[in-house]
A protein has these predicted regions:
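Short, Lys/Arg-enriched N-terminal segments with co-localized hydrophobic residues
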Residues: 5-16
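N-terminal intrinsically disordered, low-complexity, charge/repeat-rich segments that act as generic
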Residues: 14-34
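A short glycine-rich, His/Asp/Glu-containing loop-to-beta-strand
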Residues: 31-96, 152, 164
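Ligand-binding loop in jelly-roll beta-barrel domains
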Residues: 82, 114, 121-125, 134-159
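A short beta-strand-loop-beta hairpin characteristic of the jelly-roll/cupin
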Residues: 94-100, 105-125
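Residue-level marker of beta-strand positions
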Residues: 128-129
Length: 164
């Protein structure tokens, strides 16, 4: 993994997670170009948690607009689109049981994470992938260092269903 997702420390205190995001597009002649090349900084959430919104779409299939969705005010997910984000969970992250009306791909990039479900708990390590299908869950970091995860959330039809 690139250094962009590493947690930066100054004097033993963790600083905001910074990620370089490169977005391609087309110029007026239809040639491929870089539209945005910028460093995005994480935003604090609940205690011991922060996230960086990397990209989002407001429809499926996606429309390749000229807008930069990093400026959008996103919630947990979008009703008809997709969200791509990085999240950092420090040890002892505040509990937050939740579910999304989306199909979520979660990738553990570094550290360890415990995913709590109604009936089970799963210990995840760097390289592990979770396919979250609208189930209620909670992320817990019982490790000794931060855990960084990437999430891709894709809107689903009909919301949450039992018996998948």
């Amino acid at each position: 993994m690139g250094e962009a997702i590493l947690i930066r420390y100054e004097g033993g205190v963790s600083k905001a997670m910074k990620t370089r995001r490169v977005v391609t597009g087309h110029n007026k002649d239809g040639r491929s170009v870089v539209k945005w090349d910028s460093e995005l900084e994480s935003k604090p959430g609940r205690e011991r948690f922060e996230k960086v919104e990397l990209w989002a779409t407001d429809s499926l299939p996606a429309h390749l607009t000229e807008d930069d969705p990093a400026e959008w005010n996103l919630g947990t997910s979008l009703a008809n689109g997709s969200v791509f984000r990085l999240c950092r969970y420090e040890p002892g992250v505040a509990e937050r049981w939740h579910r999304t009306d989306s199909l979520d791909y979660g990738i553990v990039l570094s550290g360890e994470m415990w995913m709590e479900l109604d009936e089970q708990e799963v210990h995840l390590k760097a390289g592990d992938i979770v396919i979250q299908r609208g189930t209620i869950h909670n992320w817990v970091n019982r490790g000794t260092g931060p855990c960084v995860m990437a999430f891709i959330l894709i809107a689903t039809e009909g919301g949450v269903s039992t018996g998948w």
